[in-house]
Design a protein with these regions (language model features):
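Long, low-complexity or tandemly repetitive, helically biased scaffold regions used
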Residues: 6-138
Length: 141
């Protein structure tokens, strides 16, 4: 899932959800539209989670920053799902989306933390070798 695909999937649905009171779009095309967008976003997130290790580094980085910026919207979406006027289908899809988004963000967070730790350890391990090689090089000259 690219950041653009996620943005294109999510921002229109949040626009729909935030533009109208829930009761104004219930049983209209907007409810169906919001539901279809949530399903598409869930499918995209599920694919990203399932194929996490196949995603390029830059895509992971972009998605991490995008999901970080979406966190306030996830809180809004969670509040909206608690309203009685929201259909059970939308509640279910919205909660699944929130769960998938948080799971994916946790995966990304762990990935970047482990990557940073690995890079840090690699630098510490290679430094003595580089110093020894430099010393050997200096002594041979």
């Amino acid at each position: 899932m690219t950041a653009t695909a996620l943005q294109n999937s999510l921002y229109p649905s949040f626009g729909v959800i935030n533009s109208f009171s829930i009761y104004e779009y219930k049983d209209t095309e907007y409810e169906e539209y919001a539901l279809s967008v949530l399903r598409l976003a869930n499918d995209n997130l599920s694919q990203s989670i399932a194929h996490f290790w196949k995603l390029p580094f830059t895509e992971k980085e972009i998605n991490y920053h995008l999901l970080s910026k979406l966190e306030p919207l996830l809180k809004i979406l969670q509040k909206i799902t608690l309203e009685e006027e929201v259909s059970q289908e939308i509640q279910r899809e919205a909660l699944l989306f929130i769960d998938n988004a948080l799971t994916y963000k946790d995966l990304l967070t762990d990935y970047f933390e482990e990557r940073e730790l690995l890079l840090s350890n690699s630098k510490r391990m290679i430094t003595p070798i580089l110093i020894k090689n430099l010393d050997d090089e200096i002594q041979t000259r």
